[in-house]
Amino acid sequence: MSTIIVSSPVTAGLASRFKAHGLKLKTVVLFDTNTRKLFGEQVLRTLADEGFMVHELVVPAREASKSFSTAYKLYGGMIEAGVDRSWNLLAVGGGVVGDLGGFIAASYYRGIPVIQLPTTLLAMTDSSIGGKVAINHPLGKNLIGFFHLPELVLIDPSYLGTLPEREVYSGLSEVVKYGFIADSALLERLRSHFSSIVALEEPYLTDAIRRSAEIKEAVVREDFREMSGLRATLNFGHTFAHGLEKLADYRFIRHGEAVTIGMAAALSLSRRLGFLDRPSLEQGQSIIAEFRFPRGLLKKRFLDIDAPALLENMLSDKKKLDSRLRFVLLKALGEAFLLEEDVDDREVLGAIEDAKTFFRKQ
């Protein structure tokens, strides 16, 4: 499995960390245009000072960079620079850079090591960990990819100081998700220190990141290729969220924002089907009530949407894999499971309406 390091500055002593993992000091460094501007000089200076041979690549900071055309351009640059299988790739950025960098590393010379240096809260707690790497296809997101574990995940909470508050809230959705599925004590800490974490205050921020990374890594270790259903529990709230993202044409609403809404609906569905008691439902809702959305987003992207339209998009999103929806639900706060049985559409629609009622009251 990957070695996950949470520290600041995380790039200190990078050469010794690479050598300890059998990695050569020959690194392709992938940035997007934003992370190059924010962190490029610091990262490249550290690598130069520690004796690395470096080839730098930069892609536009947008979802469209996760494409075959971008990948081919990067392959060409690496080939022309003489990059061979003795090199590794360091991905410096959020989910787009991490996915694209992982995809390039998994496919170049049939696979070179990848090191993730995530710069967003969402990437630090979710996408950089677990080895799922992919690019998009015109027919859907993340359809072309690999399981390719990073050798190292280097997490520096101080990098989050550059994030807009909206991105912090978006990343916190995944942190809260880990509490819902695996750690009720984490939920209690989040409830007590939510505003401090949003403000990036220590030690609360690092505690939340470290515990989230531990949970994700433990789940991946037990079910790397999603064979047992355990890894599927990481998708709590995501069935609803994917429908919302699809309705928005994968624009306008952040992934974490959609997951926050989806978790509210999944909590309600867990209660409707008799798995979750009312006090637990209300405790879970009290945490979700802490989230803030951009002005008008909640109304336009959820409250004004007909529940049947959302359900239709949820179904179309899953028809590529099977003929029915699969829901991750809760038996208790901190205890998730994958429901194998079909769920009556009326219950799903009811859960969507419950979530709308909840958010209207906030």
Curated annotation (Swiss-Prot):
EC number(s) reported in the record: 4.2.3.4
Principal location listed in the UniProt entry: cytoplasm
UniProt cross-references to Gene3D superfamilies, sorted A to Z: 3.40.50.1970, Dehydroquinate synthase-like - alpha domain
NCBIfam families assigned to the protein according to its UniProt record, in alphabetical order: aroB (TIGR01357)
Cofactor: Co(2+); Zn(2+); NAD(+)
Gene Ontology annotations of biological process type: amino acid biosynthetic process; aromatic amino acid family biosynthetic process; chorismate biosynthetic process
Bound cofactor: record note: Binds 1 divalent metal cation per subunit. Can use either Co(2+) or Zn(2+).
Pathway listed: Metabolic intermediate biosynthesis; chorismate biosynthesis; chorismate from D-erythrose 4-phosphate and phosphoenolpyruvate: step 2/7
Keywords recorded for this protein, A-Z: Amino-acid biosynthesis, Aromatic amino acid biosynthesis, Cobalt, Cytoplasm, Lyase, Metal-binding, NAD, Nucleotide-binding, Zinc
Function: Catalyzes the conversion of 3-deoxy-D-arabino-heptulosonate 7-phosphate (DAHP) to dehydroquinate (DHQ).
Protein's name in the database: 3-dehydroquinate synthase
UniProt superkingdom: Bacteria
Pfam families, A to Z: DHQ_synthase (PF01761), DHQS_C (PF24621)
Residues reported in the UniProt entry to bind Zn(2+): 174, 238, 255
Cellular component GO terms, alphabetical: cytoplasm
Location relative to the cell: Cytoplasm
Recorded family membership: Belongs to the sugar phosphate cyclases superfamily. Dehydroquinate synthase family.
Catalytic activity: 7-phospho-2-dehydro-3-deoxy-D-arabino-heptonate = 3-dehydroquinate + phosphate
Binding residues annotated for NAD(+), in chain numbering: 95-99, 119-120, 132, 141
